[in-house]
From Swiss-Prot:
Descriptive protein name: Photosystem II reaction center protein X
One term under GO cellular component: photosystem II
Name of the gene encoding the protein in the UniProt record: psbX
Subunit structure and binding partners: PSII is composed of 1 copy each of membrane proteins PsbA, PsbB, PsbC, PsbD, PsbE, PsbF, PsbH, PsbI, PsbJ, PsbK, PsbL, PsbM, PsbT, PsbX, PsbY, PsbZ, Psb30/Ycf12, peripheral proteins PsbO, CyanoQ (PsbQ), PsbU, PsbV and a large number of cofactors. It forms dimeric complexes.
Pfam families tied to this protein: PsbX (PF06596)
Protein purpose: Involved in the binding and/or turnover of quinones at the Q(B) site of photosystem II (PSII). PSII is a light-driven water plastoquinone oxidoreductase, using light energy to abstract electrons from H(2)O, generating a proton gradient subsequently used for ATP formation.
Alphabetical GO biological process terms: photosynthesis
Gene3D superfamilies reported in the protein's UniProt record: Single helix bin
Length: 40
């Protein structure tokens, strides 16, 4: 499986962006849920 460096970098950048977005989304949901529990 041979991938050109540019394509590989593009793939890793997308993968990294997806992980960062997932972490941000998960953290936002977690904090919003925690905030609701604290308010109750």
């Amino acid at each position: 499986m041979t991938i050109t460096p540019s394509l590989q970098g593009f793939f890793y950048s997308i993968l990294f962006g997806a992980i960062v977005l997932g972490l941000l989304g998960g953290g936002f949901i977690f904090f919003s849920q925690k905030d609701k529990i604290v308010r109750r």
